[in-house]
């Protein structure tokens, strides 16, 4: 595959973007990552929630670029099991972890604004802006991100069903090397490479965010209904 016209990608050449995505669709995830690291603009960064099966993307990308900055947005409300998994995977892979937090601590937010996640759709929207979107935008600016690797998958939600491998977002490139993977395929990858899953996976959690806005998957539920009380699936990071 020839080197893409990066300027065309960033400035609206949709035909070039579609053709590149057509070729990327036929490539294995490992080859997609290799191609992206060779051809897409720096700085390269990888975001991770350290949720279920998160070790897949961390292993897949960091084994080819060990020094890649790994962005974790710590809302202050993550599960204790998530914090322990962050420590374990950072030590195991030698991750270049970059932790970003909200400008206001959880206690300060609750003192002034109350429990935003209990205030309906508008409250959740504001909660996500303060605790997830603003810290991530700060991280991308600080790290001068040109290409953002993320572990989104089409299976996760209807809002992601049509996402391509490669797209533009806010003047940078967003790259989804496992966009077409299903959960069993990720589970096989974990077993093949002897990688740990999130401890809460065994308790029925399939998508893990903050303690107060995440529930296990129950019979009859869709995966996207396990977050934000079913009011929202997307927090706004991956629009």
Curated annotation (Swiss-Prot):
Keyword Cytoplasm among record annotations: yes
GO BP annotations listed: hydrogen sulfide biosynthetic process; sulfate assimilation, phosphoadenylyl sulfate reduction by phosphoadenylyl-sulfate reductase (thioredoxin)
GO cellular component, one term: cytoplasm
Gene3D superfamilies found in the cross-reference section: HUPs
Substrates-to-products reaction catalysed: [thioredoxin]-disulfide + sulfite + adenosine 3',5'-bisphosphate + 2 H(+) = [thioredoxin]-dithiol + 3'-phosphoadenylyl sulfate
Main location: cytoplasm
Compartment annotation: Cytoplasm
Gene: cysH
Highest taxon of the lineage: Bacteria
Lineage of source species: Bacteria, Pseudomonadati, Pseudomonadota, Gammaproteobacteria, Chromatiales
Enzyme class: oxidoreductase
Family per record: Belongs to the PAPS reductase family. CysH subfamily.
GO molecular function ontology, one term from the record: phosphoadenylyl-sulfate reductase (thioredoxin) activity
Pfam families xrefs: PAPS_reduct (PF01507)
Keywords: Cytoplasm, Oxidoreductase
The protein's name: Phosphoadenosine 5'-phosphosulfate reductase
Keyword presence, Disulfide bond: no
Active site: 235
Annotated function: Catalyzes the formation of sulfite from phosphoadenosine 5'-phosphosulfate (PAPS) using thioredoxin as an electron donor.
